[in-house]
């Protein structure tokens, strides 16, 4: 159906728990670079980082996120950031929706039998839907080739 989003593939990059942090970050970097080369996305949408109660986990997530953003920048892929309430608003229509509502609406919008698994992949699909459904994303994507546009300063190395 023209104009309707469809899920091509989703998943999560995982690393062995016993691996030292630098090796885990390198694996995430390598896996991300491979995915970006394979799928050649037009843009990357990420959720704003916030620390809940476990700061130690948050620091690890921030380090992994930094590696992922670096690989997107290296591949000249524009990066767009959304708050959790923006994702909820775009997917459900209510910025304070519960996680289960977001997951169910994600499933319904994409015509899926089940919610994507694992939870991190389901969250990523909802963030991608938020970007696709954001009216400004179409304009932002067109403007993203200009240095300094958008939430992040995006270099255009494709010239």
Where do the language-model regions lie?
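Phosphate- and other anionic-substrate recognition elements at nucleic-acid/protein interfaces
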Residues: 1-159
């Amino acid at each position: 159906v023209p104009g309707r989003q469809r899920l091509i593939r989703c998943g999560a990059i995982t690393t062995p728990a016993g691996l030292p942090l630098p090796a885990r970050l390198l694996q995430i970097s390598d896996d991300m670079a491979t995915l970006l080369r394979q799928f050649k996305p037009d843009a990357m949408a990420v959720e704003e980082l916030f620390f809940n109660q476990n700061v130690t986990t948050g620091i690890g997530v921030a380090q992994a996120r930094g590696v992922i953003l670096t690989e997107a920048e290296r591949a000249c892929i524009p990066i767009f950031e959304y708050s959790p309430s923006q994702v909820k608003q775009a997917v459900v229509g209510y910025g304070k929706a519960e996680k289960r509502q977001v997951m169910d609406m994600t499933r319904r919008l994409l015509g899926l039998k089940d919610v994507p698994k694992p939870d991190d992949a389901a969250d990523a699909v909802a963030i991608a839907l938020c970007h696709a459904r954001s009216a400004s994303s179409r304009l932002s994507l067109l403007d993203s080739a200009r240095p300094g546009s958008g939430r992040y300063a995006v270099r255009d190395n494709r010239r």
